[in-house]
């Protein structure tokens, strides 16, 4: 099953992991792994390290080997299981860095196009569903919970930075 609450109750993942990361790319809509590997464009995913609460930026050069990081980068708290890679627990990168424009700058991208999924002027408020996540993760990953509690502040600071960079001509925003 691709997506169902039955999946969530049975496996801990709203989206079927086997369906998303094996059946679709291997059988139903074959992914061109060779074309990906041969493409000179650098491809990064952002994951949140649950132990540190910090964003990590993973360069994917081989999608077969990197698919676990892709999965982790889209694993939402409470809707997905934590993804363990080399004894490190990861969740969605948006927890620690929702708009990774500063990391992109560190990689040398000084003129950027950023697509925002909300209208201009949007400000993130604390998520009302997060107390359930705090309870779920507090004992095992206190730094992750601390990051979650400040996510709206981090997101709004990233927006402020984007608007300033837009004024300077360094960022083109699509809202």
Give a label for each model feature.
Residues 1-175:
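Patatin-like phospholipase
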